[in-house]
């Protein structure tokens, strides 16, 4: 009798609950809902020997089927787990990820450095051409007069000239560099002779060589002389040819 009563007491619902509490982790506090699900999972293991308790522990249709391990069900009661927190905050992080993708564009603009009139990105050698500076006639005359005096300017002279003309020092420096390069080309082409007046007015840099003007004068004289010699010859030929054609039918 004593041996038969011991298994019955172990198979009772109260004894199953006490066994579940003994084998569960001591530090983990469980809610009543998790305890009921845990007891149901323990009862599923012994349901083959006691079919009469299946109706009392039938699962509700709104709850999913619990796993046989009790500590798995306790995860749902604890919202402070790292996995659940990351899952809950994942939709909120989509806006942050989108803003992070849009951040590199302003950062590349901040890293632009202007060095000597050249724009460089992140210190690399990529250059972007700036629009050309349009000088007025008064500025060009002053720059040409100063270039006739000296081809190289010191820093104080360049600063003074730029301030007087309303230009930057970089613009004055670039203009003098271009002027010197063109002047050297003209010296090579013209054999070292350039009119000083044309250089002061800036005309010597626009023409290819000083010998171009006489060529234009010769072509102009040829064009004016050819029509005078061509028109009388044509008028003298036309009446004779017309008279010959008129006389031939009369002879026939």
From Swiss-Prot:
PROSITE patterns: HOMEOBOX_1, HOMEOBOX_2. It is found in: Nucleus. One of its GO terms (biological process) is positive regulation of amacrine cell differentiation. GO terms for cellular component: nucleus. InterPro entries: Distal-less_Homeobox_TF, HD, HD_metazoa, Homeobox_CS, Homeodomain-like_sf, HTH_motif. The keyword Nucleus applies. GO terms for molecular function: DNA-binding transcription factor activity, RNA polymerase II-specific; RNA polymerase II cis-regulatory region sequence-specific DNA binding. CDD domains: homeodomain. Residues 128-187 bind DNA. It comes from the Eukaryota. Keywords: Developmental protein, DNA-binding, Homeobox, Nucleus. Belongs to the distal-less homeobox family. This is Homeobox protein Dlx1a. It comes from Danio rerio. The lineage of its organism: Eukaryota, Metazoa, Chordata, Craniata, Vertebrata.
């Amino acid at each position: 009798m004593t041996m038969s009563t011991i298994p019955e007491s172990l198979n009772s619902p109260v004894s199953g609950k006490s066994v579940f509490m003994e084998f569960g982790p001591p530090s983990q506090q469980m809610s009543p809902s998790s305890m009921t699900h845990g007891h149901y999972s323990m009862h599923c293991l012994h349901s083959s020997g006691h079919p009469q308790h299946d109706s009392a522990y039938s699962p509700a249709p709104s709850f999913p089927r619990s796993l046989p391990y009790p500590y798995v069900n306790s995860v749902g009661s604890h919202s402070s787990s790292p996995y659940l927190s990351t899952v809950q905050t994942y939709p909120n992080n989509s806006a942050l990820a989108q803003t992070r993708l849009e951040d590199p564009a302003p950062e590349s603009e901040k890293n632009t450095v202007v060095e000597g009139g050249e724009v460089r990105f992140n210190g690399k050698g990529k250059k972007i051409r700036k629009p050309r500076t349009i000088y007025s006639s008064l500025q060009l005359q002053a720059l040409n007069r100063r270039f006739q005096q000296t081809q190289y300017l010191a820093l104080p002279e360049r600063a003074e000239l730029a301030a007087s003309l309303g230009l930057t020092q970089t613009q004055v420096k670039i203009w003098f560099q271009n002027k010197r390069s063109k002047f050297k080309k003209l010296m090579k082409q013209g054999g070292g002779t350039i009119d000083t007046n044309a250089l002061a007015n800036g005309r010597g840099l626009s023409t290819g060589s000083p010998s171009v003007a006489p060529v234009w004068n010769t072509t102009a004289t040829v064009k004016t002389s050819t029509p005078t010699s061509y028109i009388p010859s044509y008028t003298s030929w036309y009446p004779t040819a017309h008279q010959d054609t008129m006389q031939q039918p009369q002879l026939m």
